[in-house]
Amino acid sequence: LGDVYKRQAQLWAAEAHEYVFFIRTGHLDEETFRAYNDALLEEGLSRVEPKKDHMYTYVSVVFLAESIAPEVPKLIKKTRCHRDYRMSLYGWMDYRIAAYDCTSKRIYTNWAGRPLKQTLLSVTKKRRKHK
């Protein structure tokens, strides 16, 4: 009948990952923030697997607190971690932080965490409508 040839080619591939950690606490002070921040950044970095098809990984931390100490929003805003792997050929990683103050209904983020603010706003608006 003849020969059958099969050719497979992968033209394009990209892996994108996000690891989200939720922390619920009564009062978020500087000491608590730093302890969680250090531990979760280390944990998130350990999960990143830079390789040929890796495009990006987001490590996101969301704090849900009854109250937030006045110095913590400044710490959140100043906290940054961005890693490029092999000049971005093996992708990159961003560390995103958001904190929601349940008492004042305020949301604080670092620069990379700005998209989290929109998500938290939409979730809290829906929650307020259902009460």
Give a label for each model feature:
Residues R34-A39, P73-R80:
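"Short basic amphipathic alpha-helical interaction patches in structured regions
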Residues E31, A69-K74, Y108-T109:
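Switch/connector loops and helix/strand junctions flanking conserved nucleotide-binding motifs
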Residues G2-Y5:
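Short, small-residue-biased leader/transition segments that mark boundaries at the very start
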Residues K51-L75, D101:
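Nucleic-acid nuclease catalytic cores
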Residues K78-K131:
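Charged, structured surface patches that assemble and position nucleic-acid processing machinery
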Residues A16-Y19, Y56-V59, Y95:
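Short, surface-exposed beta-edge/turn micro-motifs
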Residues Q10-L40:
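Active-site ExK catalytic segment of metal-dependent nucleases
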Residues E42-K51:
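A short, acidic, amphipathic alpha-helical segment used as a generic capping/interface helix at domain edges
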